[in-house]
Curated annotation (Swiss-Prot):
It is an enzyme of class 3 (hydrolase). GO terms for biological process: microtubule-based process. Mg(2+) binds at residue 71. The active site is at residue 254. Dimer of alpha and beta chains. A typical microtubule is a hollow water-filled tube with an outer diameter of 25 nm and an inner diameter of 15 nM. Alpha-beta heterodimers associate head-to-tail to form protofilaments running lengthwise along the microtubule wall with the beta-tubulin subunit facing the microtubule plus end conferring a structural polarity. Microtubules usually have 13 protofilaments but different protofilament numbers can be found in some organisms and specialized cells. PANTHER family: TUBULIN. The modification N6-acetyllysine is found at residue 40. It comes from Tyrophagus putrescentiae (Mold mite). It holds the Pfam family Tubulin_C. This is Tubulin alpha chain. GO terms for molecular function: GTP binding; hydrolase activity; metal ion binding; structural constituent of cytoskeleton. The keyword Cytoplasm applies. It comes from the Eukaryota. Keywords: Acetylation, Allergen, Cytoplasm, Cytoskeleton, GTP-binding, Hydrolase, Magnesium, Metal-binding, Microtubule, Nucleotide-binding.
Amino acid sequence: MRECISVHVGQAGVQIGNACWELYCLEHGIQPDGQMPSDKTIGTGDDSFNTFFSETGSGKHVPRAVYVDLEPTVVDEVRTGTYRQLFHPEQLITGKEDAANNYARGHYTIGKEIVDVVLDRIRKLSDQCTGLQGFLIFHSFGGGTGSGFTSLLMERLSVDYGKKSKLEFAVYPAPQVSTAVVEPYNSILTTHTTLEHSDCAFMVDNEAIYDICRRNLDIERPTYTNLNRLIGQIVSSITASLRFDGALNVELTEFQTNLVPYPRIHFPLVTYSPVISAEKAYHEQLTVAEITNTCFEPQNQMVKCDPRHGKYMACCLLYRGDVVPKDVNAAIAGIKTKRSIQFVDWCPTGFKVGINYQPPTVVPGGDLAKVQRAVCMLSNTTAIAEAWARLDHKFDLMYAKRAFVHWYVGEGMEEGEFSEAREDLAALEKDYEEVGLDSTEAEGGDGEEF
């Protein structure tokens, strides 16, 4: 078996986790108490969904997941909510005081008290696996727990499970909407620390998802539940090939191999289609060509940036539902001719395609329509550097005045860590810039210096 362990850190991680596990349970027909009427092989773990659920002797299916937050309120909602019987109480780990939007508290003072408990729990989960494939880590960049504790945990996971893949699903601070003033600090510190420990990071920004909810689903004032359900669909599409017997794309490492040309350039852009409300879906026939085309429109992306200004290095199209390879090939051929998609010249325009015949499931009473087919596109494009540049600029404005820095130093950080992290991100921006250069330009440029 190729099991995956999900780790949900901080408020964002936990709430996205709730949306994901709710959806997984619906997709696999698992009831909120963990029973699965359709599963006839009790206790034996050779079904595909066993990558995400472990089975107990009594036929209960338990998510291979850990929820961690440094303060209890958000996880308490899980402890008392609909799915309280799904999880083992030890999988829900909470501290007493929160990280107060402070990376240093999450990483140093408060985080280090709880990290061993979490690792111990993860060790127990990994002992139940026959062939652990890796970790999916859900968190936000802006919060104290999401940034500080995640980076601490990733460092420790690298030590304990050196070769296992670690994929992140991270909520990136939105360009306009902000939940904390110090988001740029936390984001840059956490990115710097986790850059070498993460194999692939899928970013979503709240503002982009707000806009999608407003525009496509006609929700005037989207709530976090609306956002998280949409994120849940995306995570479900990415992990569908791990949970169902799919035709293509089955390993976590396959994502990395196909999307990450250089270790540091591991931030693919995610697009999902169709996002459509039930009223509209009734009137529209969404063909493979149509949903594939919508994936290349900037307004359907999960991070605000413009891929028309960047170049593609790699592109993965993960289809699910009623899709046949013939249609996919036709759709891709159409895109290559019609769209001005620019690939870097050192990468032939290959699209990696995954097809899963399980149609997308929706949460009953949710906003999304039940559709026959959907696609999730993961593309590694140099345009995402815009997002980093935006963040770095905000960091610089605050750091020039050393605003708020004393809160971090007071928790045991050194000011040098800020400048070190900032330099690392400057290097990351530069990396993206260089990757986008044509190979001829790059080689020619080097020659002139001497």
